[in-house]
Regions:
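Conserved active-site and SAM-binding loop architecture
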Residues: 1-245
Length: 245
């Protein structure tokens, strides 16, 4: 589905296939930039913390394999905040320390991520400019200017509504499953408008705004897949900032 979204917006993109099957022979010319973000679930402090033992984490090593083989001029690897020892292990492999950037500096959501990159002066420029960037509120991203939240528990339903005057919580790939009362993705079962006592979800367009993706960028696939792609993706303006350094 992400390929469908990419080709709709950039039809000349060359899809080279599964990273596990790629070798240097698949890239006849030199590579200027290698960007990756291996699945974060294995590393996340919110998950089971299987780290390198999680089957999904193997794609990190596929990224490293290609990075060593292709020797790109620059690289960026993104992932979630994780245990310090795992973070240190990744840093030792890549030879650089990560830079923590919260998407709240560039958008209306709190999304703390680690970025390993050899692009120079990113940390220095972030320190110099971060105070000027956090101007976008969650409220400005929403169509109705209200962030309505509810959690529905069997036999004990309760609803909460609060204005979105600050940053929205982090968008994840599982967003479509629901939102808890504190704004974190959860497993609320009923969706609808607030007037009927149910939850109002952020629309795909509002989620695109959270990720600083152009409105309508993910159109053309089912709504579930739009949420999935946006939750798994980068905050565009964060990557743009890194590349501008």
């Amino acid at each position: 589905h992400c390929i469908t979204i990419t080709q709709k917006n950039y039809p000349s993109t060359i899809q080279v296939g599964n990273i596990c099957d790629l070798t240097k022979a698949d890239f006849p010319s030199e590579i200027d930039l290698l960007v990756g973000g291996s699945p974060c679930q294995g590393f996340s402090l919110m998950g089971r913390q299987l780290n390198f033992d999680d089957s999904r984490s193997k794609l990190f090593f596929e990224y490293v394999r290609l990075w060593k083989s292709l020797k790109p001029k620059y690289f960026i690897l993104e992932n979630v905040k994780m245990r310090q020892d795992i973070q240190d292990a990744i840093s030792a492999i890549l030879g650089v320390q990560p830079i923590e950037i919260n998407s709240a500096l560039f958008s209306g959501q709190n999304r703390r991520r680690l970025y390993w990159t050899n692009i120079p002066k990113v940390a220095e420029k972030l320190t110099q400019t971060s105070g000027q960037l956090s101007l976008i509120t969650g409220k400005s991203l929403l169509s109705d200017q209200t962030y309505e939240i509810a959690t529905v528990r069997k036999g004990n339903p309760r609803q909460i509504v609060k204005p979105a005057t600050d940053k929205l919580p982090c968008l994840t790939a599982s967003y479509y499953k629901g939102i808890n009362a504190d704004g974190r993705p959860g497993k609320a079962k009923s969706f609808g408008d607030y007037e009927r006592g149910k939850i109002e979800m952020l629309s795909p367009v509002e989620c695109e705004r959270m990720q600083t993706v152009p409105e309508g960028y993910t159109e053309g696939v089912a709504k579930t897949h739009r949420y999935n792609a946006l939750g798994n993706g980068f905050t565009v303006d964060v990557i743009a900032f890194i590349l501008s350094c």
